[in-house]
Amino acid sequence: MEHELRAVVLGCRTAEKASVINNILGDEVESDRFFVKSVRREGDVNGRKITLINTPCWWKEYSTKDTREVVKQELVCSVFLCPPGPHVFLLVVDLSLPFTQEHRISIEEHLGLFGERIWSHVIVIFTRTVSLKDESIEQHIQNQGEDLQQIIQRCGHRYHIFDIDNKGNGVEELLVKIDGVVTVNNGKHFETDDEKLLEVKKKREEIQERAKDRQTMVQEKTEQLTEKGDVFPLR
């Protein structure tokens, strides 16, 4: 059993991810509604060091084509905030919302940014358990249809329900499931595909180059206007 556990938290709803992290760590830290930088949180749970990385959200039913490039890069680079790498990815899914085909495709595309091997490290975290009413989670998965079932299958049928209104409830059970993921993966943490890393590096360099070009263009335009007397330099 690993004494330290490292996890990256993914999902399309900021509040839900923050609640899951607070539940695990026993904190009451509010998360910014919109953020594009991954945030590292640490805590001690039953004598074990827990590191959780909260990542930027994507829109629930949007393709990666509609997600900002900076958000996609932050998702992929989030694994570097918990070196040497996360043991598990916690995919947060709100039970109060219908799970559509678009939602499934969006999840598959955004997790696909990490490479195919991510699926052997994913646990689905279901929140808003009050929405189950008299259903069991197994009945809910069945009733939601093929799209949710496909995600569960790709995750190796690993899932956990969190009553985020009751702090600490279900945390110990989740840690046992995370230990199970570590065991299944022979104690190895997740490592990003080299091809994906090169792709991210290339896109980041392209973004930096475009930003540099824009800055140069603005500076040149300002100098031209200053020479013409249309603007005055700030003192």
Task: Put a short name on every predicted segment.
Residues 93-94:
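Glycine-rich, N-terminal phosphate-binding loop of Rossmann-like dinucleotide-binding domains
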Residues 72-74:
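A Trp-anchored, charged/polar loop motif used as the substrate-binding/catalytic surface
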Residues 1-52, 57-70, 81-85, 98-123, ...:
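C-terminal non-catalytic interaction/localization modules
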